[in-house]
């Protein structure tokens, strides 16, 4: 990703010539939107959208990048793209990806829906290893075993280089109150303790 490359170069080689990469960035095609308002998977008019396809990789701009932050149109387009591909619910890794994107988009309903599917199906083994499918009918897949913490972190604390937001995408059920300790943010700060209680209307950090 060009944005990530330039950001890294600014940190590790601030005096380096970036003209080549900036020129390449200007050659990248703009985002395109389909007739539902969703972000298109391919930045070309040569292909129709295939919303039966299992991946949401074109929402890279939402997660792990942060291009949707402060961009209402792109945020709405990504939310619509998630909605259009709701049929992909049989793979645990797809639900993990959907959850991470929903949390970044602060879409509590979509996040809750994905988490309910993850938690209420037979994905986990007694060993706490997880399966590729949600009926344990396939092979081992570590995405959920590793990714669940990332989902919770994204839902409870958003951070970037100069910003921290608490409870940006709290799921609609199961998270009415809780405590989180020792979370490292992207700007090198540490949330030593986050405690919330929705019934009491309190958040402390």
What does each of the following model-derived ranges do?
Residues 1, 5, 17-20, 74, ...:
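Stable alpha-helical elements in mature extracytoplasmic
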Residues 1-14, 60-71, 97-106, 151-160:
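Well-ordered alpha-helical scaffold segments within catalytic/enzyme domains
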Residues 13-92, 113-129:
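Extended glycan-interaction surfaces of carbohydrate-active proteins
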Residues 52, 84-89, 102, 135-143:
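Short, contiguous acidic/charged loop-to-helix segments that flank catalytic cores in large enzymes
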Residues 55-60, 89-96, 106, 140-147:
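Aromatic- and histidine-enriched alpha-helix N-cap/loop-to-helix transition segments
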């Amino acid at each position: 990703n060009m944005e990530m490359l330039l950001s890294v170069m600014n940190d590790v080689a601030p005096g380096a010539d970036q003209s080549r990469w900036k020129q390449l960035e200007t050659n990248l095609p703009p985002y395109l939107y389909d007739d539902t308002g969703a972000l298109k998977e391919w930045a070309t008019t040569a292909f129709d959208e295939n919303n039966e396809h299992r991946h949401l990789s074109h929402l890279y701009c939402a997660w792990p990048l942060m291009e949707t932050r402060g961009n209402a149109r792109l945020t709405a387009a990504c939310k619509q793209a998630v909605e259009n591909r709701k049929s992909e619910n049989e793979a645990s890794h797809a639900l993990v990806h959907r959850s991470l994107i929903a949390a970044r988009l602060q879409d509590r309903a979509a996040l809750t829906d994905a988490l309910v599917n993850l938690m209420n199906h037979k994905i986990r083994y007694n060993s706490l290893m997880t399966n590729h499918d949600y009926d344990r009918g396939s092979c081992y897949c570590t995405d959920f075993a590793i990714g669940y913490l990332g989902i919770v972190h994204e839902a409870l604390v958003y951070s970037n280089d100069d910003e921290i937001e608490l409870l940006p995408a709290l799921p609609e059920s199961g998270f009415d109150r809780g405590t989180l300790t020792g979370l490292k943010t992207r700007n090198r700060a540490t949330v030593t303790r986050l405690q919330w209680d929705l019934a009491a209307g309190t958040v402390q950090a």
